[in-house]
Regions:
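Expand to "…catalyze enediolate/carbanion chemistry for C-C bond making/breaking, isomerization
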Residues: 1-300
Length: 300
């Protein structure tokens, strides 16, 4: 996984061609903004959106937001997008319709070349892969380990359900979401998303239910298409205060155990082994990331 910090609880899609949405994106409370060149941009306006994206990214970065960009699919002009949008303001590229590890490697190679040509930090632009076809499921492990630049993966629920001829429901999407989460964890990258349609932004009780399922699966954040979804994602993907307290206490006891030469120890009635420690470390890293982003937005 690249050095880009990627514990984003909420990633809000904003059409790259709609200036009024871009101007207010920093007010929405999302951890990151995804300037979209794909589904939300009409074909006739894609070229204009592509040209406008670098300036929009710089504007949003200056306002304290982490900025990503979703390019078009590789078959739909995605490589041309990369040639225009790659800039110091871009934290990561969201790659839609990933069907194979080769898709990831092709984009990673282009980014490596562009970083070198433009004097950008090597590996500074990460990748997030969207899995949007049932045919990609058998290749999840290959995709997840395709490049050190890959930060995480997410199921694209709408297109995925079309490919599988099924309804976009928590019951139908739980299984494939779990497969994505498992593949991410095996590869050491982060799983994003929740098992439901992201288009249902008015049904907040259903959203809460689906995001709670995602949290139980180990997801760390999710994409959203409407500002109304942001607060729910931020709340439910934030570590609870009691969990933060538990993790801090556990790590303090770990330090004591090491100082005393103890290899194993118990904390609050439970034996602690390396996986428990790793989970506590990730939880505290997520907590610190959310505090940093809150401070950055307050500063701006």
């Amino acid at each position: 996984m690249s050095g880009v910090s990627c514990f984003w609880r909420s990633l809000l899609f904003v059409p790259a061609h709609v200036e009024k949405f871009i101007d207010r994106a920093h007010e929405r409370g999302a951890d990151a903004c995804i300037l979209d060149l794909e589904d939300s941009v009409p074909l006739a306006q894609k070229s204009m959106a592509r040209q406008a994206l670098p300036a929009a990214a710089a504007k949003l970065q200056a306002r304290g937001l982490d900025v990503l960009a979703r390019i078009n699919s590789l078959q739909g002009g995605g490589l041309d997008d990369l040639e225009v949008i790659s800039s110091p303001s871009l934290r990561a590229v969201v790659l839609p319709k990933v069907g194979s590890a080769e898709d990831v490697r092709v984009v990673a190679a282009v980014l490596e070349r562009l970083e070198l040509e433009r004097g950008l930090a090597k590996g500074g632009i990460g990748l997030l892969a969207q899995i949007e076809d049932v045919a990609a499921l058998p290749r999840l492990d290959e995709i997840a380990s395709a490049s050190p630049r890959l930060l995480g993966m997410s199921l694209g629920p709408e297109d995925f359900c079309v490919s599988a001829s099924m309804e976009a429901l928590p019951e139908t999407l739980f299984g494939p979401s779990q497969q994505v989460a498992f593949a991410c964890r095996r590869a050491g990258i982060l799983p994003f998303g929740y098992p439901d349609s992201i288009a249902l932004f008015t049904d907040l009780p259903r959203l809460r239910h689906s995001v709670l399922l995602a949290r139980q699966l180990g997801m760390v954040g999710a994409f959203c298409i409407h500002p109304a979804q942001v607060a729910v994602l931020n709340e439910l993907f934030s570590p609870a205060s009691e969990d933060v307290e538990y993790a801090e206490g556990l790590l303090a006891e770990l330090a004591n155990a090491r100082a005393e030469g103890r290899g194993a120890f118990a904390y609050r009635g439970r034996m602690v082994d390396p996986p428990v420690v790793a989970r506590a470390l990730e939880l505290l890293e997520r907590h610190r990331a959310s505090l940093r982003r809150l401070a950055a937005l307050d500063h701006h």
